[in-house]
A protein has these predicted regions:
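PLP-dependent aminotransferase class I/II
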Residues: 1-100
Protein backbone atom coordinates (compact mmCIF):
# COMPACT_ATOMS: atom_id res chain seq x y z
CA UNK A 1 0.00 0.00 0.00
CA UNK A 2 1.16 3.50 -0.75
CA UNK A 3 1.53 5.88 2.19
CA UNK A 4 -0.88 8.78 2.35
CA UNK A 5 -1.46 12.00 4.24
CA UNK A 6 -4.61 12.72 6.18
CA UNK A 7 -6.26 16.14 5.93
CA UNK A 8 -5.03 17.10 9.39
CA UNK A 9 -1.40 15.99 9.06
CA UNK A 10 1.65 16.72 6.95
CA UNK A 11 4.04 13.87 6.26
CA UNK A 12 7.71 13.89 7.23
CA UNK A 13 8.89 11.10 4.92
CA UNK A 14 12.05 11.70 2.99
CA UNK A 15 12.46 8.39 1.15
CA UNK A 16 10.14 5.86 -0.39
CA UNK A 17 11.82 2.47 -0.60
CA UNK A 18 10.80 0.15 -3.42
CA UNK A 19 11.60 -3.53 -3.93
CA UNK A 20 11.98 -4.91 -7.45
CA UNK A 21 10.94 -8.49 -6.74
CA UNK A 22 12.67 -10.87 -9.12
CA UNK A 23 15.27 -8.31 -10.21
CA UNK A 24 18.99 -8.86 -10.01
CA UNK A 25 21.30 -6.38 -8.33
CA UNK A 26 22.55 -5.33 -11.77
CA UNK A 27 18.99 -4.66 -12.96
CA UNK A 28 18.29 -2.60 -9.84
CA UNK A 29 21.49 -0.61 -10.33
CA UNK A 30 20.69 0.05 -13.99
CA UNK A 31 17.25 1.36 -13.03
CA UNK A 32 18.87 3.68 -10.47
CA UNK A 33 21.28 4.95 -13.15
CA UNK A 34 18.41 5.46 -15.61
CA UNK A 35 16.41 7.39 -12.98
CA UNK A 36 19.41 9.58 -12.18
CA UNK A 37 19.80 10.31 -15.91
CA UNK A 38 16.25 11.68 -15.81
CA UNK A 39 17.02 13.87 -12.79
CA UNK A 40 15.54 11.60 -10.11
CA UNK A 41 17.80 11.08 -7.09
CA UNK A 42 17.28 7.36 -6.62
CA UNK A 43 19.77 5.51 -4.40
CA UNK A 44 20.42 2.06 -2.97
CA UNK A 45 20.80 2.79 0.74
CA UNK A 46 20.23 -0.60 2.37
CA UNK A 47 23.06 -2.62 0.86
CA UNK A 48 23.95 -4.65 3.95
CA UNK A 49 21.28 -6.50 5.93
CA UNK A 50 21.53 -5.77 9.64
CA UNK A 51 22.21 -9.42 10.48
CA UNK A 52 25.47 -9.24 8.45
CA UNK A 53 26.82 -6.17 10.24
CA UNK A 54 29.67 -7.09 12.59
CA UNK A 55 28.00 -5.90 15.81
CA UNK A 56 24.85 -7.94 15.26
CA UNK A 57 26.63 -10.89 13.68
CA UNK A 58 29.13 -11.11 16.55
CA UNK A 59 26.90 -10.25 19.52
CA UNK A 60 23.61 -11.85 18.58
CA UNK A 61 24.77 -14.83 16.56
CA UNK A 62 22.54 -13.71 13.76
CA UNK A 63 21.45 -16.57 11.59
CA UNK A 64 21.35 -16.52 7.83
CA UNK A 65 18.34 -14.68 6.43
CA UNK A 66 18.28 -15.53 2.71
CA UNK A 67 15.20 -13.45 1.88
CA UNK A 68 16.69 -10.44 3.64
CA UNK A 69 19.93 -10.93 1.71
CA UNK A 70 18.00 -11.10 -1.57
CA UNK A 71 15.92 -8.02 -0.69
CA UNK A 72 19.09 -6.01 -0.07
CA UNK A 73 20.01 -6.50 -3.73
CA UNK A 74 16.54 -5.49 -4.96
CA UNK A 75 15.57 -2.40 -2.94
CA UNK A 76 16.21 1.23 -3.77
CA UNK A 77 14.83 4.50 -2.49
CA UNK A 78 13.14 7.42 -4.20
CA UNK A 79 13.12 11.01 -2.91
CA UNK A 80 9.72 11.73 -1.37
CA UNK A 81 10.38 14.53 1.13
CA UNK A 82 8.02 17.39 2.07
CA UNK A 83 9.54 19.71 -0.56
CA UNK A 84 8.73 17.33 -3.42
CA UNK A 85 5.62 18.58 -5.20
CA UNK A 86 2.69 16.44 -6.24
CA UNK A 87 3.70 16.96 -9.86
CA UNK A 88 7.24 15.77 -9.11
CA UNK A 89 5.90 12.69 -7.32
CA UNK A 90 3.75 11.91 -10.35
CA UNK A 91 6.80 12.36 -12.62
CA UNK A 92 8.85 10.03 -10.41
CA UNK A 93 6.12 7.38 -10.41
CA UNK A 94 5.49 7.61 -14.15
CA UNK A 95 9.22 7.45 -14.86
CA UNK A 96 9.73 4.38 -12.67
CA UNK A 97 6.82 2.63 -14.38
CA UNK A 98 8.13 3.50 -17.83
CA UNK A 99 11.55 2.04 -17.03
CA UNK A 100 10.58 -1.27 -15.43
Amino acid sequence: DLPYETKTCRHSWYLYTVRLIGATEAQRNKLIDDLKAKGIGAEAYYLHPINTMPYYRDNFRAKALPETKKAATQVFSLPIHPSVTKEEIEFIGETVLSLI
